[in-house]
């Protein structure tokens, strides 16, 4: 720098991502100065947003609502990427999504693709029936492959209402029956007073969610009501109008927690609906031919209604002979119809 008079000066050295350094110098003539800057880095504490392994005899993983919100799932199948060894991948909702725990088999081997039947799904203490799910045509079709009796379709389970999930990969407790290859225990949110809304859109699907909670009372007698609705419209390939899938789920849940000096009681009633609105799938090349007769027609109707109740009582004194009791009951009605018509022409070989 030219034109400086002799005297004392303060030099300040600064650069992005480096600590600023100030030096006092006495200027008497020309001189050279070198200054080494130290990187300015701040190390934050490790933050893990993933599933938590339970420390116990059974191999199980617990997924909280914070981890669920982090990955922004479209269906329950997206949560499996939080399990040990899970891989993140784009959601494909054009075909049923089946769980595969404690098994190396996949849907690629159709003769042994029934491992998902051995995994029990529990929602708020009640089992999810997976023994009468058709989901697709019972034979080859231009509108989809066959996935009959392959297990619970995870596309039907809305993730927005989930508070936490426990996935047991080891041997589950004896109180859970009708399972051979794992347990998925889902607990949904209860209470709260906020209005929640969610919209998600990508190249293949659009999702809308709206939910509201109500609660009143005190710790001795607390009552809650939760209501929600979720709509999903998926198109795996915009060029294939036949490979689409639409789902509507709604839920109304009532809960009551009572507490006195001796016992803690909990009572809940759930009303749930799941519907798939594929309806009649169409394709210009298949619906209209030169003879005026379609090659194939396809119509699917799926509606599921369920009512469940649960009651539990627990002693606040662990030294008493009676400690706890829990009972649950549920009724489910499913209407799953698939109507398919194919044109078959006879010819000479």
Q: How does the language model describe each region?
A:
Residues 2-8:
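Short Pro-Gly-centered beta-turn/loop motif in secreted/extracellular proteins
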Residues 3, 126-168:
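Short acidic/polar hinge/loop motifs at secondary-structure boundaries
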Residues 12-18, 28-70:
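Short, acidic, small-residue-rich periplasmic hinge/interaction motif at the N-terminus
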Residues 32-36, 76-79, 98-100, 122, ...:
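N-terminal periplasmic accessory domains that precede
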Residues 46, 159-167, 174, 182-183, ...:
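Transmembrane beta-strand segments of Gram-negative outer membrane beta-barrel proteins
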Residues 59-82, 100-109, 124, 142:
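Short, polar/charged loop or turn motifs at beta-strand boundaries
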Residues 81-132:
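Extracytoplasmic beta-strand/coil segments of soluble accessory domains associated
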Residues 196-233, 239-286, 291-326:
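Transmembrane beta-barrel wall of Gram-negative outer-membrane proteins
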């Amino acid at each position: 720098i030219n034109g400086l008079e002799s005297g004392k000066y303060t030099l300040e050295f600064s650069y992005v991502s480096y600590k600023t350094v100030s030096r006092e110098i006495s200027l008497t003539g020309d001189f050279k100065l070198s200054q080494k800057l130290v990187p300015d880095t701040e190390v934050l504490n490790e933050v893990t947003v993933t599933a938590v392994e339970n420390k116990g005899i059974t191999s199980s993983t617990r997924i909280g609502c914070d981890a669920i919100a982090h990955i922004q799932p479209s269906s329950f199948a997206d949560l499996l990427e939080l399990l040990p060894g899970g891989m993140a991948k784009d959601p494909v909702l054009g075909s049923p999504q089946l769980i595969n725990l404690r098994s190396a088999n996949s849907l690629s081997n159709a003769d042994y693709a029934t491992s998902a039947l051995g995994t029990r799904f529990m929602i708020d203490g009640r089992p999810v029936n997976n023994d009468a799910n058709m989901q697709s045509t019972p034979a080859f079709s231009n509108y989809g492959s066959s996935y009959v009796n392959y297990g619970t379709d995870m596309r039907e389970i809305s993730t927005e209402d989930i508070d936490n999930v426990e996935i047991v990969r080891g041997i589950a407790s004896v109180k859970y029956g009708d399972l051979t290859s794992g347990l998925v225990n889902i607990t949904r949110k209860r209470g709260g007073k906020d209005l929640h809304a969610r919209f998600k859109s990508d190249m293949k699907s659009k999702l809308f969610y709206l939910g509201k909670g109500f609660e009143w009372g005190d710790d001795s007698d607390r009552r809650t009501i939760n209501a929600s609705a979720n709509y999903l419209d998926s198109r795996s390939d915009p060029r294939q109008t036949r490979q689409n899938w639409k789902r509507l789920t709604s839920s109304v849940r009532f809960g009551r927690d009572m507490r006195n000096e001796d016992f803690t009681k909990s009572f809940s009633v759930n009303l749930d609906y799941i519907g798939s609105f594929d309806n009649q799938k169409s394709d210009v090349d298949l619906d209209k031919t030169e003879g005026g007769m379609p090659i194939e027609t396809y119509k699917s109707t799926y509606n599921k209604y369920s009512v469940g109740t649960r009651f539990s009582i627990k002693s606040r004194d662990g030294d008493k002979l009676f400690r706890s009791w829990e009972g649950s009951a549920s009724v489910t009605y499913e209407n799953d119809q698939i109507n398919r018509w194919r044109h078959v022409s006879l010819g000479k070989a």
